[in-house]
């Protein structure tokens, strides 16, 4: 049975727990929020094999305007910790894709990224000004967007976090991006125009295809699972469409 709250997560990292709590608070503001149950073998995975300790827990919801609200927390070999979150909109609604990832190796946050990625042409014009006003001046180690990252908006934030001040600031940025997402979702109604719905479907497909070009995801998982399982997990859990 899929955990409905992630309250049983074994991760005790304070940064991940803070982000997780903030995301859940914002998610609770969505209308018609319901849990989605999936195959347990893909949702909650634990291994205590020495040297290959592994903990992955996934949570799936849906809501008005969103086909899938996914949160993943994971710990690999007691050193690599990951928080992954993607909110996929229902293509009938004019809502961007919220994505957030945090990668922590021991106490170093090597990657922290958040974005509202457009799910249709020129959609970002509706919210670019809201994101550009969010203060990001505190960060000293911003990272370069990967080649496949043309799916992101011009306001995508990507950095390594060097100290507590930057960690706290990143939490605020994630919260602000989610606030904009909630605001957008509450001000839109379902469309019936087939062409615009098809365009949004294609944008989400491309988002998933480009994300799957991130080889780091599969390389980590392949240390613990065979290729068949990894492919299924990436395509059915992380980036399905």
Curated annotation (Swiss-Prot):
GO terms for molecular function: cobalt ion binding; phycocyanobilin:ferredoxin oxidoreductase activity. It is an enzyme of class 1 (oxidoreductase). Pfam families: Fe_bilin_red. The keyword NADP does not apply. GO terms for biological process: phytochromobilin biosynthetic process. Its EC number is 1.3.7.5. The keyword Ion transport does not apply. Keywords: Oxidoreductase. It comes from the Bacteria. Belongs to the HY2 family. Catalyzes the four-electron reduction of biliverdin IX-alpha (2-electron reduction at both the A and D rings); the reaction proceeds via an isolatable 2-electron intermediate, 181,182-dihydrobiliverdin. This is Phycocyanobilin:ferredoxin oxidoreductase.
């Amino acid at each position: 049975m899929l955990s409905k709250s992630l309250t049983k997560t074994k991760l005790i990292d304070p940064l991940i727990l803070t982000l997780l709590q903030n995301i859940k608070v914002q998610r609770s503001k969505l209308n018609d929020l319901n849990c989605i149950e999936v195959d347990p073998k893909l949702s909650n995975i634990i291994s205590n094999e020495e040297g290959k300790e592994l903990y992955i827990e996934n949570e799936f919801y849906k809501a008005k305007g969103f086909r899938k609200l996914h949160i993943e927390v994971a710990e690999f070999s007691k050193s690599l910790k990951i928080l992954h979150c993607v909110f996929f909109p229902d293509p009938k609604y004019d809502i961007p894709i919220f994505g957030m990832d945090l990668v922590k190796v021991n106490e170093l946050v090597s990657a922290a990224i958040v974005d509202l990625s457009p799910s249709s042409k020129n959609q970002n014009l509706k919210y670019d000004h809201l994101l550009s006003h969010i203060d990001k001046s505190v960060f000293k180690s911003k990272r370069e967007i990967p080649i496949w990252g043309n799916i992101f908006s011009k306001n995508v934030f990507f950095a390594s976090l060097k100290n507590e001040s930057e960690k706290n600031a990143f939490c605020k940025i994630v919260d602000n991006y989610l606030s904009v997402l909630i605001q957008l979702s509450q001000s839109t109604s379902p469309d019936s125009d087939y062409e615009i719905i098809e365009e949004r479907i294609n944008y989400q497909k491309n988002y998933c295809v480009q994300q799957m070009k991130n080889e780091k995801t599969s390389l980590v998982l392949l240390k613990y699972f065979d290729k068949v399982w990894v492919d299924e997990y990436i395509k059915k859990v992380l980036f399905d469409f």
